[in-house]
Amino acid sequence: MKIVKISPRGYCYGVVDAMVIARNAALDTSLPRPIYILGMIVHNKHVTDAFEEDGIITLDGPSRLDILDKIDSGTVIFTAHGVSPEVKQRAKEKGLTTIDATCPDVTKTHDLIEAKKAEGYHVIYIGKKNHPEPEGAVGIAPDIVHLIERADDLKTLEIPTDKILVTNQTTMSQWDVQHLMEDIQKKFPTAEFHKEICLATQVRQEAVAKQADVADLTIVVGDPKSNNSNRLAQVSQEIAGTKAYRVADVSEIKLEWLQGVENVAVTAGASTPTPITKEVIAFLEQYDPMNPATWERVRKVPLQKILPRVKVKKEQ
């Protein structure tokens, strides 16, 4: 069986930066304890499990404000997905120490929304409902930001001005965003468009679109909560025309997927640890459908190998 290792794949700079920020926090003895992450620092359970070994507690809930209600003291890390001004204010009121690990691409979208609100615009924001990134973006200006996920959401959308900006969640499928923007243009012809698919998401989607078409099957390594990982599987099926499955790690691969398959493409979401992806590739490279000794699918990557290394600061 031939393995097509789609490139680029895996970690983006925003994810690595967020994890380094959190690791440095774990090593900083001057920070008030306990240290919490407000939601998953990135959408990957292997990463959050590894941070728990570092002594950092991940709390999750229906919204960032709901999670904050569970915290009365210590340090709070805001995730790469960004948070609303209300969340920052609530943390300040509670006397919590805060560390912001928001991805710079997300911050850029927040700044854009603030600027357009000051100019009297309303904003149509294309994103996934119940995902933390849209929650933070809508929270920048909830009175003028309208979240839509699909074309049906446009049917009941009414905006009391011709000054409309359209932007989006950074990890959406660029093809889905383009189609929705075309629909929005028809209903709101005066709308201005500012596509905010981050470069890492864009190039990974384009790589799948161009490289997965030679494969019989695509395996996307990524957490079920990872929107960008789920979108890679979608791109493989809808753009490259190749059946795709998303797996959290090697243990989720089903042997029946591989029956009659000669070429398997492998990619990974932007929040997927590299050792987890390498383990999937290693399994596929040694797999022999005629040899049961090659069928074992057990994740063996230790949590200590999941997080990026950071330098321990020496005391002066």
Curated annotation (Swiss-Prot):
One of its GO terms (molecular function) is metal ion binding. One of its GO terms (biological process) is dimethylallyl diphosphate biosynthetic process. Isopentenyl diphosphate binds at H43, H81, H131, S226, N228, S271. Its EC number is 1.17.7.4. The keyword DNA-binding does not apply. InterPro entries: LytB/IspH. Belongs to the IspH family. This is 4-hydroxy-3-methylbut-2-enyl diphosphate reductase. It comes from Bacillus anthracis. The lineage of its organism: Bacteria, Bacillati, Bacillota, Bacilli, Bacillales. The gene is ispH.
